[in-house]
């Protein structure tokens, strides 16, 4: 399974990338919103793990742009911002699901598998 990880925090990104690779996933890591849109448009992914707060474009703008590109890849937003308004705006931008930070890695794996199975 190929994952696009979009995370600007180097420590969080490195932790997630290493854990996902150990689970057998192929991981491409984008460090900002522009890089995320570029990678999403250039390759096929099974799921996109998308941080909300990013340099250059926030996660909502990234999700909306990915959808404008015609990508139907499931998007899981990883964020501490999970108010009802944030969730509503995310859904409107094309986000499939939210996961609040902090989270347990095993819970992330469960959510990844559930979203990919739905597709």
List each model region and its residues.
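Conserved acidic carboxylate
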Residues: 7
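Acidic catalytic/metal-coordinating carboxylates
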Residues: 32, 58-61
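The feature encodes the CheY-like receiver
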Residues: 55, 83, 101-102
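Short amphipathic alpha-helix used as the core "switch/output" element in two-component signaling
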Residues: 60-71
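C-terminal output helix
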Residues: 103-113
